[in-house]
């Protein structure tokens, strides 16, 4: 039996043990929603992240056009040109910093691989935000300013870099590009400082075995056809 597995599932599982105090019930509910593969609309923070990523993409691909704000139909006295100014959206400064790094890269690259852990076959797959010159980039957006956050090592427990580096052998680096709309924080991982994804999957499956009902859901909902 072969089952699919993703960084989203693994990270939602891990979050149950790494969430803020008092959020344990919410974290478990989020994991169960992911495990059951139930579709839910993005929450406010997720939508903000999607909007920010779209802005980065538009800038990187040269498609972004600022809004022109006309100043009441007035014209320049010498040239006769309409008077006004370009209005840039909130978070543009941070998006531009990321766009300058990922410009020329491939967006939303599907990556996958088959692997075997403890005798069980898995199909590991996902989508990289950007791949460029042997580096996988993931765009992250923080709704809080960096001044109020402790950023160092924010993603060390994420399975994302471990999973995607395993899926894309020609890549040698994974970089999280994180912005609060103004500043840029970069967190980098390679294979030497990333936990093998096989170890993470092993721990996940060992935990599932302690919850037989959830293991049954996983084997049913995440089975690979054929």
Language model feature labels by segment:
Residues 1-128:
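Metal-dependent nuclease catalytic cores that hydrolyze phosphodiester bonds in DNA/RNA
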Residues 9, 166-226:
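Metal-dependent nuclease catalytic regions and adjoining charged, substrate-binding loops involved
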Residues 44, 152-159:
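Short alpha-helix boundary/capping segments
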Residues 60-64, 141, 166-169:
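Hydrophobic/aromatic-lined pockets within catalytic cores
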Residues 121-125, 132-134, 169-172, 182-184:
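Coil-to-beta-strand transition motifs
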Residues 126-148, 164:
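Conserved catalytic cores of phosphodiester-cleaving nucleases, focusing on short active-site segments
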Residues 157-168:
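An active-site-proximal "capping" alpha-helix that borders the catalytic cofactor pocket
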